[in-house]
Amino acid sequence: MDIDLEGTVGNHLGESSTVNAACDWSGPVDLTAMDCGEHMTMGDNSPEDVLLNSKLSKEPDKYLSLSAVNYIDPNDPPVIIFHGDKDNVVPNCQGKKFFELLKAAGVKTEATFPAEGGHGGPAMYTEENLQKMVHFLDNVRQKRNGSL
């Protein structure tokens, strides 16, 4: 799938939109296997069905195209992942799967899985976790600029 995300209009065309690093805070990364074997529902629909206003059985290509795990590439920028063990919206197996797939592809990655962390909230956004994120991004920036 070739999607043009750059655009061709405006005064920004000389600027790069290359992503130099990414922070994943409890993100869904595989919409085709989101519940990791645990049935999570929102009425008659799973959280991903509600998000996409569809069903995997009806539009599998839609779910595949919106799943980050299908785009992992050894040239991807460094990624830091934070995903709480008690996330009841996006199961933390999503973060663990992302971490393992990024490592297997040779992408620089770090991950933190707070034992009491949910889908956001104080157990996730601790000073320690925020400092880990800042440190990670600073290191990427410094390496990119040749400072390290």
Language-model features: locations:
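Primarily recognizes the serine-hydrolase "nucleophile elbow" in alpha/beta-hydrolase
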Residues: 1-38
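Mobile cap/lid helix-loop segments that gate and shape the active-site cleft of serine hydrolases
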Residues: 2-4, 33-71, 77, 104
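C-terminal catalytic histidine-bearing segment of alpha/beta-hydrolase fold enzymes
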Residues: 82, 89-148
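Surface-exposed acidic, glycine-flexible loop patches that form ligand/cofactor-binding
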Residues: 12-15, 70-73, 143
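Short beta-strand/loop motif that positions the catalytic acidic residue
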Residues: 75, 80-83, 87
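Acidic catalytic loop of the alpha/beta-hydrolase fold
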Residues: 30-31, 86-90
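Hydrophobic pocket-lining residues within nucleotide cofactor-binding pockets
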Residues: 29-31, 68, 117
